[in-house]
């Protein structure tokens, strides 16, 4: 049973890696080509990529070594933030949140591998699988919301949804695997993600029109009516 959990979380880690690689390819093509080519760019490949990952064989038919495949260049890609020009300054925070979620997922795989004998009931295992399946669409949503033109409110909403899903996965994994001490790094990672999320939230609020001040013309008309 623990093999099913390990494979499920491993597939999730693979989806994160595939999403990052697809994001790099998309952004390079959108920002490094002439404007007329940008207008003709079709974002469908990334949707097909993630969709293909979601339609793989059943977890029971996969080995952990087959699903946890790391791109040899992925670490360099994640550490390099110079490949995209972002005048808004929000893209780096989105990437940071994706990095944190990616790291948490990889470490959850390792923890699950070491906690097979401590697993609780099959219901707990099912909870992990259900929550893990909810994360990949959230990753897809965040990646697609990073396409220009950027909408701060959309970025805020989708990164919040992703972080909530990952936090939920952490909770059910802790409960199912009896994880207790030595997990400060999880809370620290989530706190770091919250800091980046706060920047996106402030940008979303700043993008909303200021409704605190009344319209001068409307105010004068109201006074005349009185």
From Swiss-Prot:
Cellular localisation: Endoplasmic reticulum membrane; Cell membrane; Secreted; Secreted, Extracellular exosome
Stretches assigned to the Cytoplasmic side: 1-3
Cellular component annotations (GO), alphabetically ordered: endoplasmic reticulum membrane; extracellular exosome; extracellular space; Golgi apparatus; plasma membrane
Keyword Cell membrane: yes
Record field: transmembrane: 4-24
Coiled coil: none
Sequence segments annotated as region (Required for interaction with MYRF): 1-88
Keyword Cell membrane in record: yes
Tissue: Expressed in differentiated oligodendrocytes in early postanatal central nervous system tissues. Expressed by CD4(+) T cells, the expression increases upon activation (at protein level).
Keywords for this protein: Cell membrane, Endoplasmic reticulum, Membrane, Secreted, Transmembrane, Transmembrane helix
Residue ranges, Extracellular side: 25-226
Membrane topology type: Single-pass type II membrane protein
Any Gene Ontology biological process: gene expression
Disordered, as annotated region: 207-226
Domain of life of the organism encoding this protein: Eukaryota
Function: Functions as a negative regulator of MYRF in oligodendrocyte differentiation and myelination. Interacts with the C-terminal of MYRF inhibiting MYRF self-cleavage and N-fragment nuclear translocation. The secreted form promotes differentiation of T helper 1 cells (Th1).
Subunit comment: Interacts (via N-terminal region) with MYRF; the interaction inhibits MYRF self-cleavage.
Family indicated by similarity: Belongs to the TMEM98 family.
Protein known as: Transmembrane protein 98
Organism: Mus musculus (Mouse)
Originating gene: Tmem98
């Amino acid at each position: 049973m623990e093999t099913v959990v390990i494979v499920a979380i491993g597939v999730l880690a693979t989806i994160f890696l595939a999403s990052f690689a697809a994001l790099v390819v998309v952004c390079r093509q959108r920002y490094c080509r002439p404007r007329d080519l940008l207008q003709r760019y079709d974002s469908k490949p990334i949707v097909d990529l993630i969709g293909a990952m979601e339609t793989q064989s059943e977890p029971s038919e996969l080995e952990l070594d087959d699903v946890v495949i790391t791109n040899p260049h992925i670490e360099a890609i994640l550490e390099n933030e110079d490949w995209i020009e972002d005048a808004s300054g929000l893209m780096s925070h989105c990437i940071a949140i994706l990095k944190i979620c990616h790291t948490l997922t990889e470490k959850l795989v390792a923890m699950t591998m070491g906690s097979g004998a401590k697993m609780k009931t099959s219901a707990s295992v099912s909870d992990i699988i259900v929550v893990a399946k909810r994360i990949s669409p959230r990753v897809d949503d965040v990646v697609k919301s990073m396409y220009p033109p950027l909408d701060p409110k959309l970025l805020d909403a989708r990164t919040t949804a992703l972080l909530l899903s990952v936090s939920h996965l952490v909770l059910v994994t802790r409960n199912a695997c009896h994880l207790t001490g030595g997990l400060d790094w999880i809370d620290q990672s989530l706190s770091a993600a919250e800091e980046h999320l706060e920047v996106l939230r402030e940008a979303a609020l700043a993008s909303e029109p200021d409704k605190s001040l009344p319209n001068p013309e409307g105010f004068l008309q109201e006074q005349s009516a009185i």
